[in-house]
């Protein structure tokens, strides 16, 4: 007999969602849906607002990654005004964005993913959380807490508060860097390096236990989209867009943000409030693509920092071409963190 299984709400994720599974008479899953159940409405309630309010409003899209939305909105305002921000402001924005990336990735890897990797996917849900991780492997738990604290404290130092900082504005940032704050950030960096390297070593030791999941879970051909620098390297803040296919062929390169709508569209499905972006020439759903850490490492030719370059070369050996398994988002996040710490040290050092 066919059956519908609903998991509502889904826990251990950033946001609100549910999963619906439909099975046939043999108990095999025939359909699976992930539904975003929260109405946001940002596009609508921003209509008619003064442009200079946009960064502050857009930051409220998320309490975990507000800096990305803050900077993207400020850059849109600057494009409207045809202004270029000072180089020092660009560097400070990059540092702030990398701090957010570090704390957000630490949340995802250590708080949301590592309980499954350390304790097992069938472990008691009451124990399968960051507290269970800290109990079973105190060093790993403290490393995760330390990396998240590093990123959050750096955001607070630069932006005056950890969530929704108002430091980034159209035209740059509201104030220059205080040397005392710079020195405090530099003092935190050695511990941050030690924590991410501990996590990378641990992940590489345990990943073989999940080889079946790594090889089969959400492992499918598809496109990858992200930003790269002028030299094709890893970039988070000021790059241009590159799109590759499942074989690694470049479909689009050096695409400006203003050209996005020419090449990409958004589909709507009845089961979710989330929109579904796609590459127009391939249509929907064939033109769907992945973004984020896995996409960034797949599209980038190099990281541009010594330690992350070593890790990226090793990562690219996982497949003959782009790494397609979504399980490897975990690995990619740790490399992103390592790269971010290196760039922050370079900016402030």
Residue ranges and their predicted role:
Residues 1-349:
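Active-site bordering "gate/hinge" segments
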């Amino acid at each position: 007999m066919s059956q519908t299984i609903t998991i509502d709400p889904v826990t251990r994720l950033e946001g609100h969602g549910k999963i619906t599974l439909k099975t046939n008479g043999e108990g095999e899953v025939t359909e699976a849906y992930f539904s975003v159940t929260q109405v946001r409405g940002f596009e609508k309630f921003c209509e008619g607002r003064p442009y200079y309010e946009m960064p502050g409003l857009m930051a409220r899209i998320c309490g975990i990654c507000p800096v990305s939305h803050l900077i993207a909105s400020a850059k849109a305002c600057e494009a409207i005004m045809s202004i270029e921000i000072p180089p020092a402001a660009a560097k400070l924005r990059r540092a702030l964005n990398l701090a957010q990336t570090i704390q957000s990735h630490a949340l995802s890897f250590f708080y949301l993913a590592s309980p499954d990797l350390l304790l097992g996917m069938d472990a008691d849900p009451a124990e399968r959380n960051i507290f269970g991780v800290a109990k079973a492997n105190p060093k790993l738990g403290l490393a995760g807490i330390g990396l998240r604290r590093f990123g959050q404290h750096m955001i607070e130092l630069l932006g005056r508060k950890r969530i929704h900082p108002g430091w980034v504005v159209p035209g740059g940032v509201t104030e220059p860097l205080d040397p005392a704050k710079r020195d405090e950030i530099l003092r935190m960096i050695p511990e941050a390096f030690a924590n991410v390297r501990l996590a990378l070593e641990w992940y590489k030791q345990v990943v073989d236990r999940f080889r079946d999941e790594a090889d089969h879970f959400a492992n499918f051909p598809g496109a990858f989209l992200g930003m790269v620098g002028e030299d094709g390297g890893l970039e988070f803040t000021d790059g241009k867009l590159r799109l590759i296919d499942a074989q690694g062929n470049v479909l689009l390169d050096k695409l400006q943000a203003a050209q996005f709508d020419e090449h990409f569209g958004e589909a709507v499905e009845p089961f979710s409030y989330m929109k579904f972006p796609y590459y127009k020439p391939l249509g929907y759903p064939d033109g769907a693509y992945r973004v984020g850490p896995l996409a960034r490492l797949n599209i980038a030719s190099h990281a541009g920092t010594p330690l992350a370059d070593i890790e990226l070369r090793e990562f690219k050996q996982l497949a003959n071409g782009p790494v397609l398994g979504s399980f490897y988002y975990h690995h990619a996040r740790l490399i992103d963190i390592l790269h971010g710490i290196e760039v922050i040290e370079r900016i402030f050092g």
